[in-house]
Amino acid sequence: MPIREIRHPLIRHKLGLMRRADISTKNFRELAQEVGALLTYEATADLTLENYDIQGWAGTVSVEKIAGKKITVVPILRAGIGMLDGVLSLIPGAKVSAVGVARNEETLQAHTYLEKLVPEIDERLAMIIDPMLATGSSMVATIDLLKKAGCKEIRAMVLVAAPEGIAAVEKAHPDVMIYTASIDERLNEHGYIIPGLGDAGDKIFGTKQKDA
């Protein structure tokens, strides 16, 4: 199964705070960034390094850097923006590509309305970020788009994932690893994750939440 649930105590603690029904926009937004940063730490643990020489205080010293072109972070709009600052706090030199995906509330199917990809994306690791992996349709559509653009290495980070979404991504793109803070129980009849976080986009942006 192409998924890794990160059960670090800090992540579990922060995710518990995010599940509160009475959480403020400010606190939800800050916690989304913090958990995004912690997931980034785990999702980049196996990146390839290369050596190079620098002038240190005592002379030349060999140090390491991440090999290859700069990573591109791919937030799925709009909710993915809520994790972006947390990811960039650890990878400040990353390039940002943006993909806008909207979900039909009746069919639960996704359609892409925006794509702004960085140059030479075929030579970069792409890290997709989205708070929720529910039906998986938005994630699958984004991966489809990236692969069509030539991207060969793709990873995804989500705060909460439903088994249905995991299965959809695994079926369509078994080569893409998903990192999540929690694998939750299920989707309800409206396509919301249970117990989930509610509508993460509305909580991040302070807009009116729909009934689950």
Curated annotation (Swiss-Prot):
EC top class named in words: transferase
Give the GO biological process terms.
UMP salvage; uracil salvage
Transferase recorded as keyword: yes
Q: Tell me where the transmembrane regions lie.
A: none
Which residues of the sequence carry a binding annotation for uracil? I193, G198, D199, A200
Q: Which domain of life is it from?
A: Bacteria
Q: How is the cofactor bound?
A: Binds 1 Mg(2+) ion per subunit. The magnesium is bound as Mg-PRPP.
Q: Which Pfam families match?
A: UPRTase
Q: Where does 5-phospho-alpha-D-ribose 1-diphosphate bind?
A: R78, R103, D130, P131, M132, L133, A134, T135, G136, S137, S138, D199
Q: Which cofactor does it need?
A: Mg(2+)
GO terms of molecular function: GTP binding; magnesium ion binding; uracil phosphoribosyltransferase activity
Pathway given in the UniProt record = Pyrimidine metabolism; UMP biosynthesis via salvage pathway; UMP from uracil: step 1/1
Keywords of the record, alphabetical order, are: Allosteric enzyme, Glycosyltransferase, GTP-binding, Magnesium, Nucleotide-binding, Transferase
Function summary = Catalyzes the conversion of uracil and 5-phospho-alpha-D-ribose 1-diphosphate (PRPP) to UMP and diphosphate.
Q: Which family does it belong to?
A: Belongs to the UPRTase family.
* PANTHER family tied to this protein: ADENINE PHOSPHORIBOSYLTRANSFERASE, URACIL PHOSPHORIBOSYLTRANSFERASE, CHLOROPLASTIC
Question: What protein name is recorded for this chain?
Answer: Uracil phosphoribosyltransferase
> Which species expresses this protein natively?
Pseudomonas savastanoi pv. phaseolicola (strain 1448A / Race 6) (Pseudomonas syringae pv. phaseolicola (strain 1448A / Race 6))
Source taxonomy: Bacteria, Pseudomonadati, Pseudomonadota, Gammaproteobacteria, Pseudomonadales
| Name of the coding gene | upp
